[in-house]
Swiss-Prot record:
It is found in: Nucleus speckle; Nucleus, Nucleoplasm; Cytoplasm. Residues 7-82, 109-187 form the RRM domain. Induction: Up-regulated by paraquat, high salt and early after high-light irradiation. Down-regulated by cold. It comes from Arabidopsis thaliana (Mouse-ear cress). This is Serine/arginine-rich splicing factor SR30. The splicing pattern of the pre-mRNA is regulated in a tissue-specific manner and by development, and changes in response to various types of stress treatment or light regimes. A mobile signal generated in the leaves triggers root alternative splicing responses to light.
Length: 268
């Protein structure tokens, strides 16, 4: 996971008419903000991703704003990749900690869940997936289509049963619902479908550093930074080739003159 997610928070249950400047007003006091990505779906609630410069500021924002009442809406604030940081206000969102801060168990019997609504938390996912068996770990994270998650089962049979029973089922929480897909997790699998994984990787490589959340980095395109270096190089090559051609012509002319027969002089 990119380090920017350590300093990016998810803000859920926002009013449907909220503006970006109002989101900034809610969080600016906790530290410098790099970017705010506000999403207003056709049906509320809205949500946003707020990136801070410092991960500690993100922690402070979670502690200060999770559960905050904004215009009659109780905000839900957690670290963007599933609530992996601990604070008293987000303990219920983080599967990595219990009440005593003991780390949760992991296993090799893992499934990938895609198509989750943006408001889904690890606890929502765990509640849904435990219908198929004993869940020992769950985590959610944002992707380009919304949210995805991973769920670890304590045994192989429960994992296989979850794929059969819960694939293409309706996931619900207090805020929204969506139909999800469940498949066995592979080490190379990510939060996108197998059909478009190759094209997405190739596109992301071509974009390079310009895919950052920062507005400054978005304004810099790798293609623009490379082209000024490539153009002088092509000119220098063409100049060199033209000079070499002219030199070869002059040498060939001088050879032809030196090798041409001298006409005899006829005296009268």
């Amino acid at each position: 996971m990119s380090s920017r997610w350590n300093r990016t928070i998810y803000v859920g249950n926002l009013p449907g008419d909220i503006r970006k400047c109002e989101v900034e007003d809610l969080f600016y006091k906790y530290g410098p903000i790099v970017d705010i990505d506000l999403k207003i779906p056709p049906r509320p609630p809205g949500y946003a991703f707020v990136e801070f410069e410092d991960p500690r500021d993100a922690d402070d924002a979670i502690y200060g704003r999770d559960g905050y009442d904004f215009d009659g809406c109780r905000l839900r604030v957690e670290i963007a990749h599933g609530g992996r940081r601990f604070s008293p206000s987000v303990d219920r969102y983080s599967s990595s900690y219990s009440a005593s801060r003991a780390p949760s168990r992991r296993s090799d019997y893992r499934v990938l869940v895609t198509g989750l609504p943006p408001s889904a938390s690890w606890q929502d996912l765990k509640d849904h997936m435990r219908k198929a068996g004993d869940v020992c770990f769950s985590e959610v994270f944002p992707d380009r289509k919304g949210m995805s998650g991973v769920v670890d089962y304590s045994n192989y049979d429960d994992m296989k049963y979850a794929i059969r029973k819960l694939d293409a089922t309706e996931f619900r929480n207090a805020f929204s619902s969506a139909y999800i897909r469940v498949r066995e997790y592979e080490s190379r699998s990510v939060s996108r479908s197998p059909d478009d994984s190759k094209s997405y990787r190739s596109r992301s490589r071509s974009r390079g550093p310009s895919c950052s959340y920062s507005s400054k980095s978005r304004s810099v395109s790798p293609a623009r930074s490379i082209s000024p270096r490539s153009r002088p190089l092509s000119r220098s090559r063409s100049l060199y080739s033209s000079v070499s051609r002219s030199q070869s012509r002059s040498k060939s002319r001088s050879r032809s003159r030196s090798n041409s027969p001298v006409s005899p002089v006829i005296s009268g």
